[in-house]
Amino acid sequence: MRLTARFLALFLGVLALLSAAHAEQAADQKLLETYKAGLTLGPEETLIDPKYPIPDYVLWLLDTARGEIGYVEERSGVTKYGTWAGYPAAEWCAEFQCWCVSRVDKQYGTKLLTRVYPNYSGTNVGRDWFIGQGRYISRTGTLPGYGSQWWKDGMTPVAANSYIPQPGDWVFLTDNASGDTSHVAMVEYCAYDANGNIRLHVIEGNNVTKPAPQGVERNDYAIDYWRILGYGTVYDLADMALKFGHSGPKVVALQEELVQAGLLEARYTTGKFGAITQECIKTVQRQAGIQETGIANLETRQALRQMIENKQP
């Protein structure tokens, strides 16, 4: 009798989990259908379905941005986006996107600005914010100041032009050889063109790469366009090499793995890559027979994961 009751409780628990998973899958499918209904593709385009579920806030953000298409700055260069940000006549591509996020927060009660998306003006600030959050993918697969990137799922290197951006991702572009950001745009969708090439379609404001940037408009770019530096992403999809002086969520994740491997005390999970973390990384490298650089690159992270697996009973 007691066994039957336990079996019934277990069965009901599994049923509840399956029901919740089905409901989540149905909700994701509904959001995808809503997203597709809002798109207007060219006659020879084939939509590339997003690889990951689309959060509801991305639909709200895209709707807000679409509602601004056609807005043109005043003759003096003043815009409502710059005015909102406190810089009325400034270059305003970033201010436009941040303004859209703020409108979503106000209308839907979300708290996206400074949590999911940055609130910024100025060169490199937005890109560096995403890097600090651990949600940035370099178009080339190599991140300046960090080195190579690799996919969290599978731990394989990020190849150049391999990431197809998600709706709601932010695209950072440059117009100079230094690689500093000079423009940002919001991904609406990605599609194959008539020749089978991938193009990303964006909504953007004040595109300084054009002769006379003035308004909010749609635009599209080849996925291998040299001006694209990378993407601030909705999801945390890629890792990167970490070294002394780095900080943020990625360092926390690394330190947590070092704790799991028995190499670091939990009290040193600070999010700052200092001397103690560096020595732990050298220990991993020494035990794995790889060069002791103190840099947590892909090879080192793979060795660390193997150490953790070896500790499992």
Q: What would you call each of these model-derived segments?
A:
Residues 2-22:
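Sec-dependent N-terminal signal peptides of Gram-positive bacterial secreted proteins and lipoproteins
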Residues 24-111:
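N-terminal capping segments
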Residues 25-48, 157-160, 174-239:
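Aromatic- and glycine-rich peptidoglycan recognition patches
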Residues 52, 232-271, 310-313:
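Acidic, Ser/Thr/Pro/Gly-enriched interdomain connector segments
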Residues 58, 62, 66, 94-101, ...:
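Extracytoplasmic/secreted envelope proteins and their assembly/folding machinery
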Residues 66-74, 98-106, 173-176, 256-263, ...:
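Sec-exported extracytoplasmic/periplasmic mature domains
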Residues 107-209:
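...with weaker cross-activation on analogous glycine-rich loops/strands in unrelated enzymes
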